[in-house]
Regions:
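Structured, hydrophobic secondary-structure cores that serve as assembly/anchoring elements
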Residues: 1-91, 112-384
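Short linear interaction motifs
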Residues: 96-116, 121
């Protein structure tokens, strides 16, 4: 504070009140990978509406699934999508086709397929519409797991094997993806009514649900806009078989339209059974990582631990008040631990700071715990 003022007048002095509150990161930016006859290849293009997509890649006649998926995304509430055209050249076999989607890492700016999305930080949802090959779906799941804050929306095959819905198998176990069935009938201005994979619709519904209700709410019981029908009609008995397997159904109800009727991940871990729980933790973990990067320039001592605990607690308190966490009190909804126990001498000597966070996303006082560490390089590391 100034010790003296040399003349009469109004003086303004800015006072540092400490670090800024943690900001909630976005959750609804999607990335689409598909084959298209026109447009840039392996160069992610940001589209914020259908017109921007057609300007870069043309309309429905230029791709089998990609255009319809992006259109369904915007029609169902999506607002931002990065589109990666992996090229329309025919592959010799399934392995060759999968390789196009998996991509190659030739360095920044020259990566292809899924690798090209590693250059973009803001992607939250990853879709490869119509790609039901296990190798491609495994690659999409691995990408989301490695990038940590992304979630895969996967399609079941268009046609099920003889024997009924109990023959449907889901992808490999992962808490970073969800699987949807059946395919959706839509209108194509060049072909009439056609069947399209559900992933593009679901990515848009995720975005709509995030904006209207919050990422902590399950993206279920939502109308599928643009759907004229379904490849298969699912009965309650059939859904009772599919739901425990992590296969989310889209169903048609009398007088209620076509709706999403499931919100499970493909994980066998009960803690990560639901799509909204996984995506809520993605948002929280990324928000905390981004909002605590300043700590790498501060002395790693009890004063710092107290500031970090205060900032993260304030952020989680806002989420609790919004209904994202369960509990009659903040103590039942979350806890933050950053002290000498999480930061012993060997951690401090390594230039790291570790915070333990527990949240109750389903039941009060039943915490799902993760630890986040800030490193000298400025990067964060999360373990669950």
């Amino acid at each position: 504070m100034a010790t003296s003022y040399l003349s009469p007048g109004v003086y303004v002095e800015e006072v540092d009140r400490g670090t800024k509150p943690l900001e909630m990161v976005g959750t609804s930016t999607a990335a689409f990978l598909g084959e298209c006859k026109t447009g840039p290849v392996n160069d992610p293009v940001l589209c914020t509406n259908w017109s921007q997509y057609t300007k870069n890649f043309g309309d429905f006649k230029n791709s089998e699934y990609l255009a319809h998926a992006v259109y369904a995304f915007f029609n169902n509430g999506g607002a931002r999508a990065f589109v990666v055209n992996v090229g329309s050249e025919s592959a010799k076999d399934d392995a060759g086709k999968a390789a196009k989607y998996i991509g190659k890492d030739n360095g920044p700016g020259t990566r292809t397929g899924l690798k090209a999305l590693e250059d973009i930080d803001e992607v939250n949802i990853v879709v490869a519409p119509g790609q039901t090959d296990p190798a491609v779906q495994d690659a999409v799941l691995s990408h989301c797991e490695n990038m940590r804050y992304r979630f895969a929306v996967l399609d079941a095959p268009e046609v099920i094997e003889k024997g009924g819905v109990d023959k449907i198998t889901k992808p490999r176990d992962s808490k970073y993806g969800a699987y949807y069935f059946p395919w959706v009938e839509v209108y194509d201005p060049t072909k009439g009514n056609v069947l399209q994979p559900p992933s593009g619709f679901m990515a848009g519904i995720y975005a709509r649900n995030d904006g209207e209700r919050g990422v902590h709410k399950a993206p279920a019981n939502e109308i599928v806009r643009g759907a004229l029908g379904l490849k298969y009609g699912i009965t309650k008995g059939e859904q009772d078989l599919l739901n425990p397997k992590g296969i989310n159904c889209i169903r048609e109800f009398p007088n209620r339209g076509i709706r999403v009727w499931g919100a499970r991940t493909v994980s066998s871990d009960a803690s990560w059974r639901y799509v909204n729980v996984r995506r809520l933790f993605n948002m929280v973990e990324q928000s905390i990582e981004n909002g605590t990067q300043w700590v790498v320039f501060e002395p790693n001592d009890p004063r710092l631990w107290k500031r970090v605990t205060r900032d993260i607690s304030a952020f989680l308190l806002r989420l609790w008040r919004q209904g994202a966490l369960f509990g009659k009190s903040p103590e039942e909804a979350f806890y933050v631990k950053c002290d000498e126990e999480t930061n012993p001498p060997e951690v401090i000597d390594a230039g790291q700071m570790i915070v333990e966070v527990g949240m109750a996303p389903v039941k009060p006082a039943e915490f799902v715990i993760f630890r986040i560490g800030q490193m000298p390089s400025g990067g964060g590391e999360v373990s669950e």
